[in-house]
Amino acid sequence: MTQLSVQERFSSVRARLEALGLWDADALVRIAPGAVFRAGGEPVETDLFSAVSAPMAVLTAGRYAREFLRKPHALRAETDDAAQMFGVRVPVRTSPRRGDTACIVPDRGFVVTARFENELIAACILLEKLCMTACLSHRIGAPKALSAPLCLMEHAVYRKKYSRPSLAAARGEESAPETREVPDLALRESVIAYGKKLAENRLIQATWGNVSARIDENRFLITPSGVDYDRIRPEDIVEIRISDGSFAAGQRPSSERELHRLVYAQRGDIRAVIHTHSAALQTFAACRESLRTPEIDAPCASYGVSVSKKLAESASGVLRSHDLCIMANHGFIAVGADLETALVRAVTAENAAKRLLEAE
C-alpha cells in the first residue's frame, strides 16, 4: 500500500468534498494530529481540533449546512445511517469535545471527525443530509427522530462491526485477496459496476446501500457487507438461494439480503434490486412520508430496525405491488427487470423528491 504524504491526503479530501459541493472557503482539515490545513492548502496552527481523539477532522459546510447555521440547533438522528455514524445527536458547540463524532459550530460550519478518509467523506455527506432535512422537511411533514437507545446500539454496531473492513483497508491491514474463478462472472461485474454508478449518481455514501441481480429462479447475487464499492471484486459478490437465504460459508453478504430475497421470492418479473440512501429521499424517509407525483408512486413502508425481519417484511410488502418504496427512517429501494431499469427509477425518484422539496 502506497503511503501518501499529508499534503497529498489533504488534496484528496479537498477534491472529493469539492466534487460533492461540501467544500467551504473557510474550511480547515486535519489529516493527522499536528497536520492541519486551510482551504487553500496552507498549513495552520489551531486549537479547534485539540480535543479530537480521531486522527482526521474537517470544518466545512455545504449548501444546506450554511442555511441551517442561520438558526443552529442540535440535530437528532432521524435515519439509521445518521444514527450509525453520529449516535443520538449532533450537538452545537464552539469546538468539538473528546468523543464527538460531529458537532455544529455556530457561524463557522460543521466539524466531523473520522478514523479514515472514506469515513470522513461519508460523515460530511450524512451531516449535510441532516441539515437538508432540517431546512426542507416542513414542506412535507415532520421528521421522526429515532429513540436514543436504538441510536446508541446502531452507532456501536457501526463502530465495532460494520466499518471494520473499511478501517482495515485504510490501515493497510487487509490480507492479500484470494483470486479465484467464480461462476456468473459477467453478472457479478455488472453488480459491481452498478454499485459504482450509485456512488457516481450520489445515491449512496461509503458502504451504505446495496445492489443485487437475479441469476435464475433459484438464486441471486448481492454485494458484500461493509466493503467500499471501489474495492469490491467479483469473488466478493455473494450468491444466495432464494428459497432459504443460504450462502457459502465464509462469505459476508449485505445485511439487507433478506429484503432482496423476499422481493425475488414474491415477484418473478424482478431481476434487479437497488437500495439507496440518497439525500432528498432520505428527507421523505425521515418524515415517514410517501412520494407521489405524476411520474412517481413510492409508498412509505412502516419502520423496522435496520436489518431486522420487520424491516424486510414491511418493505417487501410494499414491493409486492409497487416498483419503488421509501423505507421509514432508513432509505429507498427500487426494483426492475434489469439493473439499468432499477437505477433509472432510483435516479428519477431522487430528482422528483428534490424538485418537490426545493419548489418555491
Segments the model singles out, each with a brief description of its role:
Residues 1-360:
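Glycine-rich flexible loops
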